[in-house]
Amino acid sequence: MNLFEKMTDQLHETLDSALALALHHKNAEVTPMHMLFAMLNNSQGILIQALQKMPVDIQALRLSVQSELNKFAKVSQISKQNIQLNQALIQSLENAQGLMAKRGDSFIATDVYLLANMGLFESVLKPYLDAKELQKTLESLRKGRTIQDKNDDSNLESLEKFGIDLTQKALENKLDPVIGRDEEIIRMMQILIRKTKNNPILLGEPGVGKTAVVEGLAQRIMNKEVPKTLLNKRVIALDLSLLVAGAKYRGEFEERLKKVIEEVKKSANVILFIDEIHTIVGAGASEGGMDAANILKPALARGELHTIGATTLKEYRKYFEKDMALQRRFQPILLNEPSINEALQILRGLKETLETHHNITINDSALIASAKLSSRYITDRFLPDKAIDLIDEGAAQLKMQMESEPAKLSSVKRSIQRLEMEKQALEMEKKESNAKRMQEILKELSDLKEEKIQLEAQFENEKEVFKEISRLKMEMESLKKEAERFKRNGDYQQAGEIEYSKIPENKKKEEELQRKWEAMQQNGALLQNALTENNIAEIVSQWTHIPVQKMLQSEKNRVLNIESELQKRVVGQEKAIKAIAKAIKRNKAGLSDSNKPIGSFLFLGPTGVGKTESAKALAQFLFDSDKNLIRIDMSEYLEKHAMSRLIGAAPGYVGYEEGGQLTEAVRRKPYSVVLLDEVEKAHPDVFNLLLQVLDEGHLTDSKGVRVDFKNTILILTSNVASGALLEENLSEAEKQKAIKESLRQFFKPEFLNRLDEIISFNALDSHAVINIVGILFENIQKKALERGINITLDEEAKELIAEAGFDRFYGARPLKRALYEMVEDKLAELILEDKVKENDSVAFVVENNEIVPKIK
């Protein structure tokens, strides 16, 4: 076996890289220096692993070696065929072969090559590191193992390569504090202490804090707050994607995983954490190969491997419950979503970390708003993750504003720029008539430039104060970490000096600057560094498209005027509007059932009396837009099979991927008015679907996804019993009796019983009709004003239109047609004939029992 056949795969790759480097630099020979540079360029190699454990500037060392290579002689005609290994390189490989034999290795590994030739590289390494320290680090990485296979040195420190040491991160204070979840952490420790099957698996929805629980365990181990059995354990998060990545040959993945398992067994103090553990099922499997789950099973069963898994309930059901052999090796720990109060405690615990990261102050009101608003409005995600995201994004937005130029200063600069351009234009014209305007511009420019100087000085002053506060906060954080480190090492004198001398001194300076900053804020500061509930409401608004004011306290005052606001659009239905207003007020006061929709109403009445218009008016009032009205025409659901369109087609049927018309619309706009129009025309089975919505406030679609209706208002309109409502000879009691009879015929009792309110809309009277004419005319008036034409309609004309267009049986709809014929058509003719132009006024008056336009 020659020298090259005795090299490990990694050393062979290093030699190939050195050869490519020599070709690139046009060097005639490959030297040990080329080998060293190739090792420094391999981020996964043993040399880089060793240097990362030492206080070395790797980039500076790399540049130093490169400058040495640049000194070598260059040859113009060089190719792979005529390049040679120089004598020094061959000698260095022979040196490594000698050391290999002494160590009992079967192949020359990369670390052996380095150790055997440390003298060759000493001159270039000396300015950056101690050669003896490097030797010690390389030896520690080997851990006394021998190289018996060509790829054995690729698997040195498999855990370091494929995992992240969470206990080390906890030691360096790089993990966020873990608040609560004590029961789950204690249960996890109990399982880990067991003799066999000592593998807990954390189950919970995405964002409830599964990974945080494991980080909490790592922190407790570092703080020695665990049972004696778990002291000195290391929690290492295994990255499965790194294990699979770059596995070129069949069996390479399995070999890597086996090396990790062997390393864990040998060390006996490692707890493996596999996040998204369901990915081990099928991971790395190929034809004739084993997946990760089957490789792990024997070690898990014997208790040789301490593993903590984390996955969602859905993935656990899909992968683990099908494989009983894998399932029984893990002990499940269920993590439920925390309550709003528990989430608030978590946020308060994270507050300091987030403040330090973003260099801002987070008010407690922002934390409360984050927990409450995320719980109410962001229904498709889970606490505490969604609340933390809100705070984080709000803080990032504030930080961005802090680091940008204030809006007030930008506005002044833009005004100066605009006036300067206008001044130049006037100077070019040289007209005497421009003299007055020029004087005004010069005066404005003088004032604005003075204001700009003041604002810039204020901005710089505020920036300086804020910068100093930020520096002191960072200093405070590092002092706390230092004190913690001294305590852990038992140096209580140094820890005491920091805690009782340096920290109070730092705090005093910070408090003085904070008082100065608060005084600036009271005097109208340009910069704002405090995150408030308004900032959080803005972020929620960006995510959900719900207007900001709807989420804040001011909305409650607005709801008190709901009746008068709705009556501006819906006329002659005072009783119906009062019933709607009461339900909305109950909800806003927090007295209604939070597990049901905000309100569920059945609107009864003849056609054209304002049932659909009431739903539109409600959407406009609550959400400032008719777009938040989800309208579904129930006459499209006459057949039984059409019902599936509401929640989505069943698996295997056309349209399964598209989802349901009702469920998809509510998922996209969870805060809206849902209008089911002409509900009596739908198939009776549709009402069975609605029972769950009315009772529990949610509906499960064809894919098994739960759609939340708790923030919707459900309105059903129907023409049932419209005959009784139109009958003038019946008393109110007789009408109600007739309505109840009609409802019993069309709807099931369990459906009617779940509705909040059954509201009857009366037939319109003549007074209401005249008011409706006024409302409809306002729409035409707005369109005319867009063209610069002002139009008016007198009372007599309104009465004439009401008389011509109103029909008791058809409601207010024919009024639109009457308005088109008697007003709009005549106005259109005048515009097209150029008889009416911009800034003209047209009055529509009655002459000889006919409406005629009068141009002014």
Swiss-Prot record:
Residues 85-144 are annotated as: Repeat 2. Residues 338-545 are annotated as: Linker. Keywords: ATP-binding, Chaperone, Coiled coil, Cytoplasm, Nucleotide-binding, Repeat, Stress response. It holds the Pfam family AAA. Residues 764-856 are annotated as: C-terminal. The keyword Transmembrane helix does not apply. ATP 1 binds at residues 204-211. One of its GO terms (molecular function) is ATP binding. InterPro entries: AAA+_ATPase (IPR003593), ATPase_AAA_core (IPR003959), Clp_ATPase_C (IPR019489), Clp_N_dom_sf (IPR036628), Clp_R_dom (IPR004176), ClpA/B (IPR001270), ClpA/B_CS1 (IPR018368), ClpA/B_CS2 (IPR028299). GO terms for cellular component: cytoplasm. ATP 2 binds at residues 605-612. Residues 157-337 are annotated as: NBD1. Its main location: cytoplasm. It is found in: Cytoplasm. Part of a stress-induced multi-chaperone system, it is involved in the recovery of the cell from heat-induced damage, in cooperation with DnaK, DnaJ and GrpE. Acts before DnaK, in the processing of protein aggregates. Protein binding stimulates the ATPase activity; ATP hydrolysis unfolds the denatured protein aggregates, which probably helps expose new hydrophobic binding sites on the surface of ClpB-bound aggregates, contributing to the solubilization and refolding of denatured protein aggregates by DnaK. Necessary for surviving high-temperature stress. Homohexamer. The oligomerization is ATP-dependent. This is Chaperone protein ClpB. It comes from Helicobacter pylori (strain ATCC 700392 / 26695) (Campylobacter pylori). The lineage of its organism: Bacteria, Pseudomonadati, Campylobacterota, Epsilonproteobacteria, Campylobacterales.
